[in-house]
Amino acid sequence: MMTMNRVSRRLLLALVLASPVPVVLANGVPVPKAIDGQGYRLVKDWDFGKNIRDEAALRREFHTRYIYENGKLDRLKDEWQRYRDNENHVFDDGGLSLVARVTGGLKPGGIESGMLRSRWTGQYGYFEARVKVPAGRGLWPAFWLNPEDQVWPPEIDIMEIVDNGRDTTRNSFHYVHGHGPKKTRNMESKLDKSGSYRPGVDYADGFHTFAVEWTEDRVRHFVDDVMVVDRAYVWQHNDGRDAGPAHVLMNLAVGGGWPGAPSAATAFPARLQVDYIRVWQK
């Protein structure tokens, strides 16, 4: 019996050592399976349930407007919301919520919402966020990368989810890797590598992780640790120049041409719940 116990323990130990176990850093952050063993290190850990828990900490790490117009731009194109700081970044037990609120009527300019633009910038790496998106027609949560030099394009949309009742719903996410020819007339013609992924689940039902591995010549998208996109891609401006470092953005837009107008059934306040945003680099 004693011999059998030793054999059993040795066999169990061998099985454990042979099993794929995620590496956990000293701060308790697991290395994502997609990049485990590839030499990545954690460079930013914006954990809204642990190390960023109030407005002061948030402001040290993030701006709350776009970089354009001297850092004061509060919307893009025909979006209805205006990004503000009036109860639009709300901390609770689970993390941070970017909150869209109707403050002046359900119309363009009548909605305030929240956004984050990182003060940190970097080029290449593995960018991951764990979020729960809101349900409702006309809502447009997004997690993306944009150059710090204020020249657009390119951009990398890690996740965009809309429910416009037509081509894209909450059980898909849209991705964009943008750069293209000169003298184009609109945004869509410049975004030369885009598409959607539909796993058959409603992202508004719970938290999900969205990530991109961005290298000098490729982008790989991951949803809940599953790779869904793998494409050749070069980060450059329309004139062929390298676009340099990017900042990280997370925002909850409302309305506009793609998501359409909110419907009477769209519930406000609407919340994009953010557990964490992390960046890994080599």
Task: List each language-model region with its residue ranges.
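N-terminal signal peptide c-region/cleavage motif recognized by signal peptidases
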Residues: 20-21
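N-terminal export leaders
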Residues: 9-13
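Extracytoplasmic entry segments of secretory-pathway proteins
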Residues: 7, 24-26
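GH16 jelly-roll
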Residues: 27-282
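N-terminal secretory signal peptides that target proteins for export/translocation
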Residues: 1-6
